């Protein structure tokens, strides 16, 4: 019997409670053994200035998932030079773990963008995409996507960075403390 592993990729700049809830709900609803958080270095679709360093983002992720044995961090995309493509990462993971079915978890904002992903026609044969509802985004695309139910949330890393003074309620307590201690996103 194959293992069932979820993957939640993103910049995690910063990681927030909606990321945690997405991972928990996907694990529970799909019966996944574990969730791999996959922070990326240079997402092909984003151009971000003022972002936290790779090390800071990994540290915040570690603080967020601390004590949850079935949640892990995979930093392979941070080690790459150039842009990070999910296709390349999944090709490598499948080669390393041929006895595993991978479930790639994406929010509504990414479902809408899915047809533009690099090698998407090959990628949909390699993984099962799991779409999580997000307000104001279309979740209908010409690919098979497993949808999971989750209370809708409007939390986004961009909004947190842009309104850092009022962000504590959207962040795990340890992540909020880290942001304050390291004065990230202009927080003093």
From Swiss-Prot:
<keyword id="KW-0520">NAD</keyword>
<keyword id="KW-0548">Nucleotidyltransferase</keyword>
<protein>
    <recommendedName>
        <fullName>Probable nicotinate-nucleotide adenylyltransferase</fullName>
        <ecNumber>2.7.7.18</ecNumber>
    </recommendedName>
</protein>
<keyword id="KW-0547">Nucleotide-binding</keyword>
<dbReference type="GO" id="GO:0004515">
    <property type="term" value="F:nicotinate-nucleotide adenylyltransferase activity"/>
</dbReference>
<dbReference type="GO" id="GO:0005524">
    <property type="term" value="F:ATP binding"/>
</dbReference>
<keyword id="KW-0808">Transferase</keyword>
<keyword id="KW-0662">Pyridine nucleotide biosynthesis</keyword>
<comment type="pathway">
    <text>Cofactor biosynthesis; NAD(+) biosynthesis; deamido-NAD(+) from nicotinate D-ribonucleotide: step 1/1.</text>
</comment>
<dbReference type="InterPro" id="IPR014729">
    <property type="entry name" value="Rossmann-like_a/b/a_fold"/>
</dbReference>
<keyword id="KW-0067">ATP-binding</keyword>
<dbReference type="InterPro" id="IPR004821">
    <property type="entry name" value="Cyt_trans-like"/>
</dbReference>
<dbReference type="InterPro" id="IPR005248">
    <property type="entry name" value="NadD/NMNAT"/>
</dbReference>
<comment type="function">
    <text>Catalyzes the reversible adenylation of nicotinate mononucleotide (NaMN) to nicotinic acid adenine dinucleotide (NaAD).</text>
</comment>
<dbReference type="GO" id="GO:0009435">
    <property type="term" value="P:NAD biosynthetic process"/>
</dbReference>
<dbReference type="Pfam" id="PF01467">
    <property type="entry name" value="CTP_transf_like"/>
</dbReference>
<comment type="similarity">
    <text>Belongs to the NadD family.</text>
</comment>
């Amino acid at each position: 019997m194959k293992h069932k592993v979820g993957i939640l990729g993103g910049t995690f700049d910063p990681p927030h409670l909606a990321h945690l809830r997405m991972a928990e709900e996907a694990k529970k609803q799909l019966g996944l053994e574990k969730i791999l958080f996959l922070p990326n270095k240079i997402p092909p679709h984003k151009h971000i200035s003022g972002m936290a360093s790779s090390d800071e983002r990994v540290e915040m992720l570690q603080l967020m998932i601390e004590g949850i044995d079935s949640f892990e961090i995979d930093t392979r995309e941070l080690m790459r030079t150039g842009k990070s493509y999910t296709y390349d990462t999944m090709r490598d993971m499948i080669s390393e773990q041929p006895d595993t079915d991978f479930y790639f978890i994406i929010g509504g904002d990414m479902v809408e963008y899915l047809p533009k992903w690099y090698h998407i026609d090959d990628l949909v044969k390699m993984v099962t995409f799991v779409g999580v509802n997000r307000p104001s985004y279309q979740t209908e695309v010409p690919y098979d996507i497993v949808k999971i139910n989750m209370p809708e949330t409007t939390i986004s890393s961009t909004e947190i960075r842009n309104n850092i003074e009022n962000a504590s309620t959207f962040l795990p307590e340890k992540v909020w403390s880290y942001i304050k201690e390291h004065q990230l996103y202009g927080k003093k």
